[in-house]
A protein has these predicted regions:
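Hydrophobic transmembrane alpha-helices and their helix-loop junctions in integral membrane proteins
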Residues: 92-102, 106, 125-140, 153-394, ...
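N-terminal signal-anchor/start-transfer transmembrane helix
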Residues: 7-26, 223, 230
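C-terminal TM-helix exit segments that contain a strictly Trp-centered aromatic cap at the helix terminus
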Residues: 42-54, 184-191, 390-391, 496, ...
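Transmembrane helix-loop-helix hairpins at membrane boundaries of multipass inner-membrane proteins
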Residues: 2-4, 18-121, 200-204, 509, ...
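Alpha-helical transmembrane segments and their helix-start/interface "positive-inside/aromatic belt" motifs
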Residues: 27-38, 167-177, 373-379, 480-488
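Cytoplasmic/organellar membrane-interface segments at the starts of transmembrane helices
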Residues: 363-364, 370-377, 437-532
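Peri-membrane helix termini and adjoining interfacial loops of integral membrane proteins
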Residues: 52-65, 192-203, 357-358, 400, ...
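Interfacial loop/helix-cap signal at membrane boundaries in integral membrane proteins
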Residues: 57-77, 409, 413-417, 523-527, ...
Length: 532
């Protein structure tokens, strides 16, 4: 079963190479890309089942090289869950993009947002980068995964070559390069101090370093990952970068790319620097991220920008769980990451559907969507309740699990009073998230079209143009394939609620593995034949 581990990365890379050879032959590119993602999903599910059955991580040493020069690929419960959820989102978004391309391709007057000769190869490279980051067993391979993401995401965010997208791409690439440089410097410092970049081996060796050295290394990694995860105050770039990209690209970015940063923080805090605690700093950052993000969201008139700010705010929930430093906190974080990847990606896809029906996603210019596009209304309503934390959806279950983990007060890495502040911030964030989303529903869906133009609030920030009144739009602007892909993701988000019991069991097991990383360290070091 270990032989399947590298297939997660190799399958999309091989698919990307084949799609390039297909040139502009649309159907061939679609067939190759779709097959690659289906195979990747199958491999991810097989790896999760294998890890669940054996209870032990799967390890592959690429090329047979031992540490510190070898490339370690490791799949434990946490990474297995991440790659399964990732595969579901990537496949659904690809189906959405195919449907969008089919509609645009059939209309000679419409320029495709996802040009076939560029989109599918780059999309598969992006998938390979995400997979590589989730299963990397050493810091340098994690860095390589980040760089693959950086190159592919820059191409995707600038598709179409508009001024807005180029400007967003420049902002994104500059910030990402700063993050990558900090990460690379941290890797060099860790290698100089420990003689390895393998995370399992670092975990065993870092404890003998002076506490000041450990703190510097810890903070260097944290800052690099915090930029990628969009933690306050390093989240300024996200609302200006993500909204400008095509809907499928934005959905993947919002659902997955920031979670790679969160995953790296969780892995760092649980494995590498478990004994060097900076949880108080993390908790303060989590609280600030939740509140600043959601206050930004309620001031937006554009749905894309509003969702970008809610994305930032809900990253705060995950950092809150990590900062608790307990098994229950980490377990709840794992479940919430799964929930947020799916729901956030779904909402951005629905926003893409709204734009194609109404010609805009600015709520001050929207109206009558419930009558014009009832399917889109349903597809928006369910994830709206989910992200807002309405019971019994997974958003509610995940938040409650995080709050209970903090309220337990057992073995916390932060003062109890600070945890209560975090819980209060989380409750406020949940209420304001629901307010922001209900505002979209009331103005965009419930309000009649002839009422559009009323000014709702002087605090509203409008950064989008009015729709072209000469274009007649309705639900036929969306293909059935686009609705099917979005509906599939909505169904999976509902499944997180229906099967919450078994999923929480797996999340609890993942949290237990994170708290007691001995099995991870032993499996990796034994596989390499090295001494910790």
């Amino acid at each position: 079963m270990n032989a399947l581990v590298p297939l997660l990365v190799l399958t999309p890379l091989f698919g990307a190479a084949l799609t390039l050879t297909a040139g502009r032959r649309r159907r061939m590119q679609i067939a190759i890309a779709s097959l690659s993602m289906v195979v990747s999903l199958g491999v991810a599910v097989a790896l999760l089942l294998a890890v669940q059955t054996t209870g032990q991580p799967l390890v592959m040493q690429v090329g047979g090289w031992a540490a510190p020069f070898g490339i370690s690929l490791v799949v434990d419960r946490l990474s297995a869950l991440m790659v399964v959820i990732t595969s579901i989102v990537l496949l659904a978004v690809m189906v959405f993009s195919i449907g969008q391309g089919n509609v645009d391709h059939a209309d000679e007057d419409t320029e495709e947002e996802t040009p076939v000769s560029i989109f599918y190869p780059t999309y598969l490279v992006l998938a390979a980068g995400v997979y590589n980051a989730f299963i990397a067993g050493d810091l340098f391979n994690l860095y390589v995964g980040f760089e693959i993401l950086l190159v592919a995401s820059f191409v995707l965010i600038t598709l179409g070559g508009t001024v807005t997208r180029i400007r967003a791409g420049v902002t994104y690439i500059i910030v990402s390069l700063v993050s990558s440089v900090l990460f690379l410097i941290a890797i060099a410092m860790i290698f100089a101090a420990t003689g390895t970049v393998n995370m399992a081996t670092i975990s065993a060796r870092v404890g003998v370093l002076p506490s000041e050295v450990q703190l510097v290394l810890h903070l260097m990694l944290l800052v690099g990952f915090a930029i990628k995860a969009a933690l306050f105050p390093l989240s300024f770039w996200l609302p200006d970068s993500y909204p400008s990209a095509p809907a499928p690209v934005t959905a993947v970015f919002a659902g997955l790319l920031t979670k790679v940063g969160v995953y790296a923080i969780l892995r760092t805090e649980s494995l590498i620097f478990a004994a060097n605690d900076i949880s108080v700093l993390l908790m303060v950052v989590a609280i600030a991220t939740m509140l600043v993000g959601i206050f930004g969201a309620v001031a937006q008139a554009g749905i894309r920008r509003m969702l970008s700010f809610t994305l930032i705010s809900h990253i705060g929930y995950m950092i809150f769980g990590i900062a608790l430093g307990t098994e229950s906190g980490w377990s709840a974080t794992v479940y919430y990451i799964m929930h947020h990847i799916l729901v956030q990606a779904t909402l951005f896809l629905v926003t893409g559907l709204i734009e194609r029906v109404a010609g805009t996603s600015t709520i001050t210019h929207l109206g009558g969507m419930l009558k014009r596009a009832p399917t889109v209304a349903v597809l928006f309503f369910i994830p709206m309740l989910n992200l807002g934390g309405i019971p019994p959806f997974s958003g509610f279950l995940g938040k409650v699990a995080l709050f209970i983990a903090g309220a337990e007060g057992t073995g916390l890495a932060v003062p109890q009073w600070l945890v209560w502040v975090g819980i209060a911030a989380g409750a406020i964030t949940s209420l304001l998230t629901l307010y922001a989303l209900i505002r979209v529903w009331n103005l965009g869906f419930w309000r009649e079209l002839d009422e559009v133009g009323d000014v709702e609030s002087p605090l509203t920030i409008v950064l989008e143009e009015e729709p072209d009144a000469d274009i007649v739009r309705d639900e036929r602007n969306n293909s059935k394939l686009m609705n099917f892909a979005t509906g599939g993701l909505v169904a999976v988000t509902v499944a997180l609620t229906v099967f919450a019991g078994p999923l929480f069991t797996i999340a609890d097991q993942a949290g237990e593995n994170l708290r007691d990383s001995g099995a991870y360290i032993q499996t990796v070091t034994n596989e390499e034949g090295i001494k910790p």
